[in-house]
Regions:
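A conserved pocket-lining segment of Rossmann-fold NAD(P)-dependent short-chain dehydrogenase/reductase
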Residues: 167-188, 196-200, 204, 211-213
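SDR active-site strand-loop-helix element
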Residues: 8, 33, 73-77, 111-117, ...
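Mid/C-terminal beta-alpha module of Rossmann-like enzyme folds, strongest
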Residues: 200-261, 275-278, 283-311
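Conserved glycine-rich Rossmann-like NAD(P)H-binding loop of the short-chain dehydrogenase/reductase
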Residues: 27-37
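Conserved Rossmann-fold NAD(P)-dependent oxidoreductase catalytic core, especially the SDR/UDP-sugar
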Residues: 94-132, 141, 146
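Conserved beta-loop-beta element that borders a ligand/cofactor-binding pocket
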Residues: 136-156, 166
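NAD(P)H-binding glycine-rich loop region in Rossmannoid oxidoreductase-like domains
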Residues: 50-94, 102-104, 117-121
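N-terminal Rossmann NAD(P)H-binding glycine-rich loop of SDR-like oxidoreductase domains
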Residues: 5-25
């Protein structure tokens, strides 16, 4: 378990979960490279024996020496939210170019690329466009690797999705739902996804593109109800017209450069996406955690449920 694993962008949702699970399995030579200082500090506190460097992986520098002797790279870096297109280019596209070059130059033998289900989405937003370009770069690189396309994920350290929704629920007198709330989601438990990544690492799965979606279809409003139950929240859930919800988000964005939820993400929420469900439990030898159990683990785990990352 001493092979060197490098995780660019490893201080985010997937990275923090992956490090925790790798450590539980006995992996001891893990390097995390991430530019989000606050989340880097969270990782240093929760996993003090992991090598963590706060760097911008879109800019070549001395940090590339961490690829020397690496056995595995799991490419995790991603700009998910925001309103500045150039941030998506820098963090999703430019960074990928730098890392792919490093993998080739340093002769790293194995790569796992984390793409996104949005590359097949009908949505057209900054995240979708940049992730499509990123995946195309990986495919064109000539590096044979598994490409994993997860849907919306939740779990420990979730700052952006269900984690933010749960904290928002604790702070407001009522919880607003756009329209009727019947927007079908296929949420993926990040614990399951990390076990898929580990399966790739341990079995050196070769080239292929895999759509990794949650095996349960759950409407947005029912996700909120499950969060309410798991956190014992008393906040009432209130439906408001879609147009008003959109206007409120637009107004919020005028005062917040990096809002937790944008009008583009609202449009993506209401897009009628249904992603392919493959037999990833059979393919990767990983069982699917029932949604209700996964929600309970997310919000009630004694080790990590109270750890919160920054946006």
């Amino acid at each position: 378990m001493n092979e060197k694993i490098v995780l660019p962008g490893g201080a985010g949702l997937v990275g923090q979960n992956l490090v925790a699970r790798l450590k539980d399995l006995g992996y001891s030579n893990i390097v995390v490279l991430d530019k989000h200082r606050a989340n880097v500090e969270v990782l240093r506190k929760t996993q003090p024996d992991v090598v963590v460097e706060c760097v911008d992986v879109s800019v070549p520098g001395e940090w590339l020496s961490h690829f020397d002797g690496a056995a595995v790279v799991v490419m995790l870096q991603a700009q998910i939210g925001g309103t500045d297109w150039q941030e998506f280019v820098r963090n999703n596209v430019d960074s990928t170019r730098v890392i792919l070059d490093a993998i080739k130059t340093k002769n790293v033998p194995y790569l796992v690329h984390i793409s996104s289900s949005v590359v097949e989405s009908v949505a057209d937003d900054f995240y979708t466009r940049s992730k499509k370009e990123q995946e195309e770069m990986v495919l064109a690189s000539g590096i044979p690797c598994p490409i994993l396309r997860p849907t919306l994920m939740f779990g420990w350290f979730d700052r952006k999705h269900l984690g933010w929704l749960s904290r928002f629920m604790q702070r407001v007198p009522v919880f607003p739902i756009p329209g009727n709330g019947r927007y079908m989601r296929q949420p993926l438990y990040v614990g399951d996804f990390c076990r898929i990544i580990i399966s790739c690492i341990e079995n050196r799965r070769g080239a292929g593109v895999y759509n990794i979606s949650g095996h349960e279809k759950v409407d947005y409003i029912d996700i909120i109800r499950e969060i309410k139950q798991a956190t014992s929240s008393k906040t009432p859930i209130v439906r408001i017209p879609y147009g008003l919800f959109y206007a409120l988000l637009w107004t919020w964005s005028l005062f917040d450069k990096n809002p937790p939820f944008t009008t583009q993400q609202l449009a993506a929420l209401s897009a009628k996406d249904e992603f392919e469900v493959i037999d990833w439990p059979g393919t990767f030898g990983v069982s699917s955690t029932p949604f209700k159990k996964a929600i309970d683990e997310t919000f009630n785990d004694p080790r990590y449920s109270s750890v919160v990352l920054e946006f």
